[in-house]
Amino acid sequence: MTQTTTHSTTPDTKTGTAEPETMRPAAPAKAVKPKTSAMIASIAEPGQRTTAAPFGHALAALAEQDTRVVGLSADLAKYTDMHIFAAAHPHRFFQMGMAEALMLGAAAGMAETGLVPFASTYSVFATRRAYDFLCLDIAEPNLNVNVVGALPGLTTGYGPSHQATEDLAILRGMPNLTIVDPCDSVDIEQAVPQLAAHDGPTYLRLLRGKVPTVLDEYDYRFQLGKAAELRTGRDVSFISTGLMTMRALAAAKRLEADGIDVAVTHVPTIKPLDHAAIARAAEGGRLVVTLENHTIVGGLADAVASSLIFESQLGSLPQLRRIGLPDEFLLAGALPTLHDRYGLSTDAVVTAVQEWLA
């Protein structure tokens, strides 16, 4: 790298002539950090209201009321918002290192003694790497261990090593396990105490960092095991979960301007599924569209289709379409670009519905 120097002169007090000062290296220019879709990237739209670390603050607040609550992390406390809990309750936080299986085994032991553990890591590590421990140490004895998986679906641009696009498909078949996919900060804050009070293991698909705040504008309260109709509509019925509920609501408003009346039913609990709410959302001869931040294989779309076929009393099945990630490993890149590419953006949802109704 070429190094530049500066030159200046000062008068010589003896001769009156100007002599060069000692040459000094120029101060190096400050490096400009490139903008990346790092693991801490936010899913919030520009200008959208957000709440910082809702999970960490909700867990810390719960621990003030319930001395049984403990937190564990597999060396990712900062990136799962568990650092908020650790700072508030340092003697009830356990840093387990990069050992997800060990973390879940330890959490199971804590639950056996009557504690209520929340164990956090990335979703890919909780589901792919530690599945056997979750199954046999936690789910089989039906222990109240709450597994918190950050970066669910396409919420990071780091590629297949960190994108948990199939976590629901992996876990839906596990007996005793309750699965929650929250939409926003409101969902997360209200879900935490209900997960702690639940009799049995849970898996929370965590949105972390600056999480959008959306559901406070609706007459909504999180209820474990229940879905909620957020908006009525006669033409199209959206059945959505996770962050795709905020996209569903935004798309519904856009479609309304085109004269398309869209209902939105939010399904925060994937398992057990609220079959009655699913059946109601499919009534009226409307186009039914499922929306999920997950592969279209083994997630909400499959759960809804199965519910309508085997659990509902509908005389005829509705026309059903699905919006979700493709059955493939995804690219790395900036989140807005990836959401457009794979059909999760509001623009993509609006376009898909318009084409289906054409």
Regions found by a protein language model. Name each.
Residues T2-R205, K210-V211, ...:
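Thiamine diphosphate
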